[in-house]
A protein has these predicted regions:
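Short acidic alpha-helix that forms the nucleotide-activated donor recognition element
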Residues: 53-57, 194-204, 224
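Short beta-strand->alpha-helix junction loop in the catalytic core
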Residues: 27-29, 97-99, 124-125, 134-150, ...
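N-terminal subdomain of nucleotide-sugar transferases
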Residues: 1-26
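Acidic donor-binding loop of glycosyltransferase active sites
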Residues: 203-213
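Conserved catalytic-core segment of nucleotide-activated headgroup transferases in glycan assembly
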Residues: 2-11, 131-198
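A short, active-site helix/loop in glycosyltransferases that binds the activated sugar's phosphate group
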Residues: 100-108, 113-135
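Catalytic binding pocket for nucleotide-activated donors in carbohydrate/polymer assembly enzymes
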Residues: 217-287
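Extended catalytic core of nucleotide-activated donor transferases of GT-like folds
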Residues: 30-113
Length: 307
C-alpha cells in the first residue's frame, strides 16, 4: 500500500513535477493488472510497453523497490535501445525495509543515470544510510496517518489477539504460552484476508502482536484502530522513544516472560486506555501524513535530506 500512496500523492503534484504518472510492475515479475486485496482504481502497466509507447522522453523517473534493485540493473543493461529515447534518467530506490537493501547494487544504477534513495522509516533516515547506499538520500517517511482511522474503545473490543503472519523462531513458543495461560483469548494469525477484512478485524481486536520488523502495519494499524499492540524493540525500525512504551519489549525472552501478565493487567478500561493512548500519541507524532506530503514535494524539487 505504500507504493499506492506514493503513486496517488505523486499524481496530485503534477503541477510541481509536470509529468505523467503511471504504476508499473517490476520487469521480470509475473504480470498483474491491479492490487486485488484492497479497494483501488489503479491499474498496473508493463514498463517496457509504456516506454515503447512513449517514444522520446525529456525526463524519466523510475521508483524502484528496495528488493528489486539488482533486477533493474540487469533489465536496464539489456534495454539500451529503450534508454536511447530518454534524455535524462533518474532512478530512485525506495528503501521501505532497510534489511532488504543488503546485497542490492544501488551504485550499479549510476551507469544509467542519476540515482537517489528515499527512506520510509525515521530510524534509518540518517547519514549512516546515506554513506551505506552511496547516493543522495531523502527522508520520505511514507505513511497513512491516524486521521484515516476510527478507533474503537475498550467496551467495543473482543477478546481477540491478532498476530502478524511473519515467521519467527519464538512464534510457536509465544503463542503456545498465551493460548495455555489465557484460554478465553482467541488468537488469529493474519492470513488470506482482504484489507477491508483486516481493517474490520483489528477494529474488533483488543490486542495485536507482530513478529515482523516491529514498526510495521501489524503494530501501527491496530493502535490507530483502538487496539494495544505488542512488539520487540528493533533499533533498525523503531526510534528510541518507542522503547519507553510498556508493550514494546527489549527482547523476545522478556516478551515471553511478561506478555501474559501484561495482557491480564491491561485488560480493564482505565489501564487499557492509558496503555493505548501512550502508543497512539507517539505513533500520531511519528507518522504524519502532512509531513510525508511535504517530504514528497521536497523530493520532486530536488531538495534532499542527505545530498
Amino acid at each position: 500500500m505504500a507504493i499506492t500512496a506514493l503513486y496517488e500523492e505523486t499524481r496530485k503534484l503534477q503541477s510541481l513535477h509536470n509529468a505523467e504518472v503511471v504504476m508499473c510492475s517490476v520487469p521480470g515479475d509475473p504480470p498483474f493488472l491491479k492490487y486485488a486485496w484492497f479497494k483501488n482504481d489503479n491499474y498496473i502497466l508493463d514498463l517496457e510497453s509504456v516506454l515503447k509507447r512513449c517514444g522520446h522522453l525529456n525526463h524519466l523517473l523510475l521508483h524502484i523497490p528496495d528488493y528489486r534493485v539488482n533486477r533493474l540493473v540487469e533489465w536496464l543493461s539489456a534495454s539500451q535501445a529503450l534508454l536511447k529515447n530518454i534524455e535524462e534518467l533518474h532512478l530512485n530506490v525506495l528503501a521501505f525495509n532497510i534489511d532488504l537493501m543488503q546485497g542490492q547494487n544501488v551504485t550499479g544504477l549510476e551507469q544509467f543515470g542519476s540515482v537517489t534513495c528515499t527512506t520510509a522509516h525515521q530510524a534509518y533516515s540518517n547519514l549512516t544510510t546515506r554513506e551505506a547506499v552511496g547516493v543522495a538520500t531523502h527522508s520520505l517517511l511514507i505513511c497513512k496517518g491516524a486521521e484515516f482511522y476510527s478507533p474503537t474503545g475498550y467496551e467495543d473490543k473482543e477478546q481477540l489477539l491478532v498476530v502478524s503472519p511473519d515467521a519467527h523462531p519464538f512464534k510457536e513458543l509465544v503463542l503456545q504460552q498465551i493460548a495455555r495461560e489465557l484460554p478465553g483469548l482467541r488468537i488469529q494469525v493474519i492470513a488470506g484476508l482482504t484489507y477491508d477484512e483486516f481493517a474490520s478485524l483489528i477494529r474488533r481486536a483488543k490486542w495485536s502482536l507482530t513478529f515482523g520488523e516491529g514498526l510495521d502495519g501489524f503494530f501501527v494499524e491496530p493502535v490507530f484502530s483502538g487496539s494495544i499492540s505488542f512488539a520487540v524493540f528493533n533499533e533498525r525500525f523503531f526510534t528510541p522513544a518507542f522503547a519507553d512504551l510498556e508493550t514494546v519489549y527489549p527482547s523476545w525472552d522478556i516478551l515471553l516472560e511478561r506478555i501474559v501478565e501484561d495482557i491480564r493487567r491491561l485488560d480493564e478500561p482505565m489501564a487499557y486506555n492509558q496503555g493505548w493512548q501512550q502508543a497512539y500519541d507517539l505513533l500520531s507524532q511519528h507518522l504524519d501524513t502532512n509531513r510525508f506530503r511535504e517530504n514528497l514535494r521536497s523530493f520532486y524539487r530536488g531538495e534532499y535530506t542527505f545530498p
